[in-house]
Amino acid sequence: MVKELARIIEIPEGVAVEIGDDATVKVTGPLGTVSRRLWYPGIEIRKDESSLVVDAEITRKRHRSMVGTTAAHLNNMIKGVTDGFEYRMKAVYSHFPIQLKATKEELLISNFLGERKARSARIMGGSQVEVKGDTVIVTGIDKELVGQTMANIEQATKVRGFDVRVFQDGIYLVDKR
């Protein structure tokens, strides 16, 4: 019993996809350009008129899973350049009000648990961080960079050495779009 491995991804109007010789896929859309090398032995990515086809030469379990992974990466790249990704986070505190300030490279978190020294969270490559009161909005076109920026912010406010059931201060994810 041989299963059909090929995954077909439709390319929406206004999006251009280029596939290089070294399996580098470049997706350009209204919001910008995302480029990524999607190489795996035995996996082939080819472009038809208005779609991308991800196929494998071998029908083993590892290759089936890599076809799905590659197709998911391509879908995320297409969604990123058309709609973008947005994560909303909320600063939660009980006594000491957290003060947030975003620069181009980092988010400064002051007065966290009453600490005198400000904590900082690194903002990754193509992500933008906007602070509105206690809400932090992370946006961008690369899902992995936006997600890593969100994780950096959450990890910067992790409470260590105290009972996390009591000390629930921090900046937490509340919405993904």
Tell what function each PLM region has.
Residues 1-177:
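Ribosome-associated RNA-binding proteins
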